[in-house]
């Protein structure tokens, strides 16, 4: 199994956590996003979107998009489960994960910020945009789990929600967001970071970390 990623990619970070929780050890193949290595013809032949992560299983099957990869891993390697059994709880976990993966992350990722710069947006405004996107999204996520006792986002075990939350909080801090405004999210993050699977997946622990 091979995982194509980049140490700072929050989408790849999610998948690294899932792989660690499942006890899987793929070969890690880094692609430097800031240097454009994801646009190399050889990589585009694997992932036409030119994004990370991409997972290649032992049969050569290629999977893209972090949440699709994580759900596939959860189905093929069901222990420990990353989604609750109850259909309603599953829907709530997915809604939280999608709020981050679809609504927050895409509008502040490297590709979008680079395009803003190409269009002549001042660096100060680019930074403001990224911080705004994180603040707006995390505030909504805080409300989504405000009534959940925890310690994780949904219950006493990590789910896909936690796999999305921890990397996004790292992004928010990088963009200068004061995350103390989200105590319930920080409670879930603290529980997650006590687990080796999360700690080992952190960007600064990766072979391509800068």
What is the predicted role of each segment?
Residues 100-194:
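GST-like fold's C-terminal all-alpha helical module
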Residues 198-210:
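Terminal-tail/helix-coil boundary detector
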